[in-house]
Amino acid sequence: MSIWRSVENGITLALRVVPKARKIGLGGTVPGADGKPRLKISVSAPADKGQANEAVRDMLAKALRVPASRITLLQGLTARDKLVRVEGDPETLGSTVETLASGGTDS
């Protein structure tokens, strides 16, 4: 089962967010609360008033090389498991996500 899925004009991406992390970065897959694989993303921002969500969006935008305005949170506003939509070429985005899932980056 993949952590991403092609949709019209983009992809959806399943995430597992770790707020207030000591080591920030993204990469690798971990099981979510539902047992399905998700891309792990660790941010230093707290899960308070959307700060972690904003940090996640900024980190994803940089890693996927898209403007942050092209990333939309679909599910998980207050949860660690999130589903986001990323607008862009599904093939290019999917390839980048696969690279992140297999290795990842640390900031």
UniProtKB/Swiss-Prot annotation:
Species in which this protein is naturally found: Granulibacter bethesdensis (strain ATCC BAA-1260 / CGDNIH1)
Similarity comment: Belongs to the UPF0235 family.
UniProt-listed Gene3D superfamilies: YggU-like (3.30.1200.10)
Listed name of the protein: UPF0235 protein GbCGDNIH1_0277
HAMAP family documented for this protein: UPF0235
Domain of life: Bacteria
